[in-house]
């Protein structure tokens, strides 16, 4: 249920923050993912934008665990392995 809040209300809350706070502390997903990949010495084949969008897609599956059912852990692992194979193999 917490991820439903995040999906629906994060944008609203972000707009309420003062601009200087956002400038100092908020970065888009791609910035954080780029930093993590660079620290690991990884360069995704499809580029950073694709890697960031893929990670966002994987994160969004968390809010659909109930619909996916008891196989969610295996489904997520399959998706992650496939994404890694496509981006880095």
Which residues are covered by each model-predicted region?
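C-terminal peripheral helix-coil segments that are non-catalytic and often amphipathic
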Residues: 31-43, 52-89
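Secondary-structure edge/capping motif, primarily at the C-terminal ends of alpha-helices
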Residues: 6-13, 62-66
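Amphipathic alpha-helical packing segments from all-alpha helical-bundle domains
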Residues: 4-5, 14-42, 49-53
